[in-house]
Design a protein with these regions (language model features):
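Solvent-exposed beta-strand/loop surfaces, strongest in extracytoplasmic domains of secreted
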Residues: 1-172
């Protein structure tokens, strides 16, 4: 802001021989620099990123001024693939922020893989007969994704002795 600087109170030898004219000066106070940086965050594939308004750091606040929230946005959605996406910070709100020239710095959103569970089925066979290979069950798929191929095998054969044998799935 701009403020007047006033002068007054003339004193000195012979000052009475002058008509003193006072003219104010101007004091300009420039905004202080303030940097607001979006914090890096993580999300999970299939979930809409929940960035909130408090995932930021501020550098340069003075005199008890505060930031209570910042708009944080990203182009990532619940259907965005695993990878990294920018987080944009803007629109800081708080106390005393009119005294600052605010610069915003981006952060990074990392979308991590969702958990996909492939469970091999169970079954029974009789000693001496051909061994069936049970199917499988898939859980954890999101966004209409599908599993089209899973290899299921077991370690038993028609000549295996009675007992429990592992059934393994792979290739999803």
């Amino acid at each position: 802001g701009r403020y007047d600087i006033n002068v007054s109170g003339d004193a000195g030898s012979g000052i009475s021989n002058y008509m003193v004219v006072y003219r104010p000066g101007t004091l300009t106070i420039d905004p202080a620099a303030l940097t607001v940086t979006a914090n890096d965050q993580t999300g999970i594939y299939g979930q809409t990123p929940a960035l909130g308004t408090t995932g930021f750091t501020a550098n340069g606040l003075l005199n008890g001024d505060t930031i209570s929230g910042v708009n944080l946005t990203t182009t990532a959605t619940g259907t965005s693939g695993v990878g990294t996406y920018g987080i944009t910070a803007s629109g800081a709100v708080g106390y005393g922020l009119g005294n600052y020239d605010i610069t915003y710095q981006p952060g990074t959103l990392t979308i991590d893989p969702a958990t996909l569970t492939v469970t091999a089925g169970s079954g029974t066979s009789v000693y001496g007969e051909s061994v069936s290979t049970p199917g499988y069950k898939v859980s954890g798929l999101v966004n209409g994704d599908t599993v089209t191929t899973v290899s299921v095998d077991n370690t038993a054969s028609s000549t295996s002795a009675g007992g429990d044998y592992a059934v393994n799935g792979s290739g999803a």
